[in-house]
């Protein structure tokens, strides 16, 4: 058993290092660590004011069966050290911060072969309404993580960055039902078919709506970079319409009209995200992993609708380019 020196009331004594003793059951543990560590994160940006995140961290290491416990205090030492380097401008992105922490954990926990860092926070996005240009803000949930694996050479690190955005969708199925009903009524009123079609182009029919939550994360190697702002933009553009905290009457009419001119199923949202990811991030390494999900809160049903896709950048490219399209 190793001993630790401590100072108490002016004298030194040696205490046993209980964590380094043998456990009663000698099996390896996949993850040992701390969860919900709240920290203020300041990330510098060239030519702009820093971005401030109030974040929750989960920090883990694996533990061999020969040790009773992990030295959890080292996790706090590492994260404070890396957060200070972020304030000093050495860290530019939150996923880079997670990567730094994961690497340093391997240095601090010499017995660990794998470390993992997860970060959850909120990001304020400034914008303006579509008609009146009223300035507004939106809170977006953001996520970052990193996993470091010890090797005989340098550690292998995989990092990810993602966001969750709320928007609005309009149901295409119910809209089609309402349109056929309106067409029947107008035909019975002897309105010409060309005028009916012209009307539908300008005034889309009513349908039920959903408040949708889109999620997108991209996992890459440690050398690649994914801009958080682009992820947020993809999410906003993949639903029927973005939503806003404050809407004047002209803005409100524009948002409702835009949504009903762009009806989308939950499946459509996920596929549109995938298309935009391919267009925006197609130059990332082919083994980069994309996770896309859409969760819609139904207005006329008691359930929610959900769709998801996980694929590599290479797999998305093959499907979007038609190379692996299943037409059976």
From Swiss-Prot:
- Please name one Pfam family that this protein belongs to: GCHY-1
> Which one of the record's GO molecular function terms can you name?
iron ion binding
Which pathway is recorded for this entry?
Cofactor biosynthesis; 5,6,7,8-tetrahydromethanopterin biosynthesis
Q: What class of enzyme is it?
A: hydrolase
Site label May be catalytically important, positions = 171
Name any cofactors this protein relies on: Fe(2+)
The record's note on quaternary structure and interaction partners says:
Homodimer.
Q: Tell me the protein family, please.
A: Belongs to the GTP cyclohydrolase IV family.
What protein is this chain from? GTP cyclohydrolase MptA
- Can you name the source organism? Methanospirillum hungatei JF-1 (strain ATCC 27890 / DSM 864 / NBRC 100397 / JF-1)
Gene encoding the protein: mptA
